[in-house]
Amino acid sequence: MSTLAFLSPNGAEDVAVARSPMEGKAKAAGARFEVQGGWNVAVEYPGQDRVGQTAGFTDASHLRKLELQGDDVPGELGEAKREGDAWICQLTPTRALLLGGDHAAPPYAVDVTTCFAALTIFGPQAREVIARFCALDLRPQVAPPGSFRPGSIARQPGMIVVEDEQRFLLLFGWAVAEYVWTVVDDAARSLDGGPVGWGALQNNA
């Protein structure tokens, strides 16, 4: 099924708006949406200021994701290298993911944005939230900022980028996104956390 929804207000020219597979969950949680970069993005939730003091999570599925292939792909295994406002994460010696950013894509890049859904979990208890559904060792001395860890997330294949000491980007299959949201939401709420809008996340960057 296509991820694009078409809007035709007042008979105007059709505008394609891409939507996250977790949009339904976000709506049910009271999200307010704005169209940003062609995506319908959840930017605010009721009570999110309180949530951000413990552990918040936000839908980051709209981040651009490109797969780079070749004998000289950048990066090192196990590391996430910061390049401007993007991350480069090497999957194998010949494959890497470029996450985020708005620079021109290399001609050999494959757009895999809608192959991977994404959630960012942040806050003082972010590691504790993740530990409730993921066995990857994310202790600071083992996985400092700039680490890249493929593994199981909520019993699904996934990857984690350690963006900062209290901020983690989780990537997982588009098709299982609603299930992963439910698992993460349960874990966060058990610690008095919950969903946070994309705008608030940027303010905490």
Predicted regions and their residues:
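Basic, glycine/lysine-rich polyanion-binding surfaces/domains
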Residues: 1-205
